[in-house]
Amino acid sequence: MSGLNIYFILQICSHTDTYFFIYSLSITLFFFSKYKMGVCISHEYSKPNAEQAEILQDFSKFMKPEERPPMAVEHQMYDYRLVEEEQDDELFAIVCCPHSIGYERDKIALVDLDPTSETFCTILSEVHLTSNGDEPGRMNWAKSAESLGEMNKFVRRNIIVPCMNSGKIYVIAFENEKLWIEKEIRNDELIRKDVSCPYAVRSLPLKGAPVHVSTLGDRFGNGKGDFILIDRRTWEVRKKSEPTFSDYGGDFSLQPRHNLMISSEWGHPRLLRDGFMPSELENVSESFGARLHVWQISPPKLIQSINLDTCDGSLVICVKFLHNADCNHAFAISAIGSSIFHLHMNTLTKEWAADRVAHVPLLKVENWQSDEMPALLTDMIISMDDRWLYVCGFLHGVLWRFDIQDPFRVSLHGKINLGGIFDSFPEVRIKTSNAMEDRWWLPPETRSLPRGTKFRGGPALMQLSKDGCRLYVCNSFYKAWDAQFYPELISDGGQMIRVDIVDDEMQLNEKFLIDMKGQPNGPFVIRDIKFLDGDCTSDSFL
């Protein structure tokens, strides 16, 4: 209890007037509640009402000056309008295109996003990887911008492509609309460091800082959450100096200003490659991870592990810090459990917590693989102004938009249907019992077709423009999952579509479609999108 609270208690004890006692007690409780927490207090307690304000004014003379205890920085959003004129709309994107069957090499392609161009929605150039079946994960640029204003002021020349199946890591060079392989890091280099299955890439905006790559397994393919570091000048691989690792690896996010990193847990790589088995889903605690890990970036050190409920938090597929480097808030989503978590730190105790702020319920269905269908959340994106959170449900075929201006009180703002099981398999129907539940979570009945073409599969991975007006969506996440739920993705290839945010609502752009069906040596699927001049996922601001 602070000195201020003790002071008011002494005031209470020194007065016998009942009326004064009641008012003094009210003040004591009010200030004790306001100062007992260390995280974003304004989001946990409402402003005083008129009566409380009057009490504060009447008894302000009794208030003893005291320093405010250390608080977490309030959630503040970027005002994108301040730098909007300095930013360019995305004209090109680099996309990852694995071969859907695997008898041809995967490729990385440059696509045209400029609606005024004659080559709009076509592949301008491409580079094939060196072997079949590499299965690229989440690629990223080797260089990060320090801030939003710096995005257009430096050249992005190299993109790092980790491959989950082959264990290779490719360094792809880009210049003058040409792509080529600058460096191939072979699997045996990772095996010697007792890691395998590289998945996600993040870069620091510091000069000379290495590229971080998360790995999902050990040398034998068992679950092991670790990281390797890649020198940006020589492309040499080294292991992090701290020997601690988690049970499982997964996605991760960097916050360099606070020297923090948060990583998630997936599961055993060998299980992920086989898709979802009923036996694994019945006992998720033995097959998948349900923890988030908070690390110190440099020198590397595990700070805290956060245990999530296994029903809600198993297989946390994605985790991201807010863009505003002053804030130490983050969000995460789980594939199994289809939940959204808000991560925040109490700056008095330095303890991190993960609150479940939203949950997409199971749908009761008939004529499907199971009687209940999860949403299977596969990706999320936070807008550059830290106001909106986009989450896609791979099976339900829905993209949700959440308002996160108050990260403690996340609210669902809108949704749009993009394919899904119900589009791919008309015989699958939602049982009428779902009508009694919250209809906000049911897939929308209205559907649109990009260029009159069916959107195969469901929304899997996304990218958002810096101004938050154009959301690009592709329909492949991992080929084992694609084949299990949407066989037509394997036979016909993947697609990339665009959702426009107009008047605060999401609308499918019916003129935009990149379809890999009919590609030479195909079919290919599309996943992971990176804009040349920066986007909402590539950079870790300082």
From Swiss-Prot:
Keywords attached to this entry: Selenium
Stored SUPFAM superfamilies: 3-carboxy-cis,cis-mucoante lactonizing enzyme
Cited Pfam families: SBP56 (PF05694)
GO MF terms held by the record: selenium binding
Regions annotated as coiled coil: none
The organism's place on the tree of life at top rank: Eukaryota
InterPro entries on file: Se-bd (IPR008826)
Transmembrane segments: none
Family classification: Belongs to the selenium-binding protein family.
PANTHER family: METHANETHIOL OXIDASE, SELENIUM-BINDING PROTEIN-RELATED
The protein's name: Putative selenium-binding protein
Organism field: Caenorhabditis elegans
